């Protein structure tokens, strides 16, 4: 049996995608609609307080295209905290006008493919801790997609030796390093949590960088032979103080 890669796991992750039911929202009187939005703003401002205590983080983006209108991404130390957030969100009046279109449950993950040998406790390493328990950037754009490593009769990632996988992941990682300073990447593991094995969340102030890195990696052997991808979601950042304009209906 091939050796399994060991992982370091950080904050639990929940991506929630919603489409706005504009037809139903349109017939709500303006004063009631304003109250819905204010309640939603207060909820998100309250959940965002974890950032100052370094016990979680969150991001809100307006998704481009018809797959969704809003992405809410929450990071928390425990899975049950994500359940609490989602349950409380569903009780908001605005939730009656937001249609769930997709969700993804995972956990921030680092693998040992490229790690050197050390007796150090990795969870005490400041660099590793910053990646496992990150402060999310306020970049203009976000890109999220789920993915698997292929396993069929011709190409099976899980039948490769650890050395073969390490070599492939090294080459794969060298492409990613070319985009340092242009893209911030977060990998979340989801084996046993969701329908794919990993989620990839990218941040950038230049949306074109998403196309460039994904295209370039198509020529990398790790992706070309072993990568399988779900739907891609791209969007622009939206702050809670912009909700009045976002939900405004003239």
From Swiss-Prot:
Q: Tell me the residue numbers annotated for binding Fe-coproporphyrin III.
A: 131, 145-149, 172, 185
According to the UniProt entry, where is the signal peptide?
none
Q: One GO molecular-function annotation for this sequence?
A: peroxidase activity
Q: A GO BP term, please?
A: heme B biosynthetic process
Cofactor comment text: Fe-coproporphyrin III acts both as a substrate and redox cofactor. Was originally thought to use heme as a cofactor.
Q: Which cysteines are joined by disulfide bonds?
A: none
Pathway listed for it is: Porphyrin-containing compound metabolism; protoheme biosynthesis
Q: Which cofactors are required for activity? A: Fe-coproporphyrin III
EC number(s) for this protein? 1.3.98.5
Gene inactivation effect = Deletion mutant forms slow growing small colonies under aerobic but not anaerobic conditions. Mutant accumulates coproporphyrin specifically under aerobic conditions and shows deficiencies in catalase activity and peroxide resistance.
Q: Which reaction does it catalyse?
A: Fe-coproporphyrin III + 2 H2O2 + 2 H(+) = heme b + 2 CO2 + 4 H2O; Fe-coproporphyrin III + H2O2 + H(+) = harderoheme III + CO2 + 2 H2O; harderoheme III + H2O2 + H(+) = heme b + CO2 + 2 H2O
Q: What InterPro entries does the annotation carry? A: CHDC, ChdC/CLD, Dimeric_a/b-barrel
Alphabetized, the UniProt keywords read:
Heme, Heme biosynthesis, Iron, Metal-binding, Oxidoreductase
Question: How would you classify this enzyme at the top EC level?
Answer: oxidoreductase
Q: Which residues form the active site?
A: 145
Q: What does the UniProt function comment say about this protein? A: Involved in coproporphyrin-dependent heme b biosynthesis. Catalyzes the decarboxylation of Fe-coproporphyrin III (coproheme) to heme b (protoheme IX), the last step of the pathway. The reaction occurs in a stepwise manner with a three-propionate harderoheme intermediate. The first decarboxylation step is fast and yields the three-propionate harderoheme isomer III intermediate, while the slower second decarboxylation appears to control the overall rate. H(2)O(2) is the assumed biological oxidant, but either H(2)O(2) or peracetic acid yields the same intermediates and products.
According to the record's subunit comment, the protein's assembly and interactions are: Homohexamer.
Record HAMAP family: Coproheme_decarbox_1
> Which PANTHER family does the record associate with it?
COPROHEME DECARBOXYLASE (PTHR36843:SF1), HEME-DEPENDENT PEROXIDASE YWFI-RELATED (PTHR36843)
Family statement: Belongs to the ChdC family. Type 1 subfamily.
Name this polypeptide is given: Coproheme decarboxylase
Q: What species is given as this protein's source? A: Staphylococcus aureus (strain Newman)
Q: Which gene encodes it?
A: chdC
């Amino acid at each position: 049996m091939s050796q399994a890669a060991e992982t370091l796991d950080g904050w639990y992750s929940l991506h929630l995608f919603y489409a706005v039911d504009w037809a139903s929202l349109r017939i709500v009187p303006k004063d009631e609609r304003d109250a819905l939005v204010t309640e939603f703003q207060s909820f998100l401002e309250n959940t965002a307080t974890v950032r100052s205590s370094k016990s979680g983080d969150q991001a809100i983006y307006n998704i481009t295209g018809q797959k969704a209108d809003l992405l809410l991404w929450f990071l928390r130390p425990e899975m049950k905290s994500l359940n609490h957030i989602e349950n409380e969100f569903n009780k908001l009046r605005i939730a009656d006008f937001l249609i769930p279109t997709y969700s993804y449950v995972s956990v921030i993950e680092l693998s040992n493919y490229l790690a050197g040998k050390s007796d150090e406790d990795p969870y005490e390493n400041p660099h590793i801790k910053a990646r496992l328990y990150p402060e999310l950037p306020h970049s203009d754009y976000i890109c999220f997609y789920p993915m698997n490593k292929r396993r069929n009769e011709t190409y099976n990632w899980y039948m490769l030796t650890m050395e073969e996988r390490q070599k492939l992941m090294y080459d794969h990682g060298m492409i990613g390093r070319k985009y340092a300073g242009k893209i911030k990447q977060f990998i979340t593991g989801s084996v046993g949590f969701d329908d794919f094995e990993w989620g990839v969340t990218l941040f950038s102030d230049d949306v074109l960088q998403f196309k460039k890195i994904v295209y370039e990696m198509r020529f990398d052997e790790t992706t070309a032979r072993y990568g399988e991808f779900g739907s891609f979601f791209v969007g622009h950042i939206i702050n809670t103080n912009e909700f009045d304009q976002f939900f405004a209906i003239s």
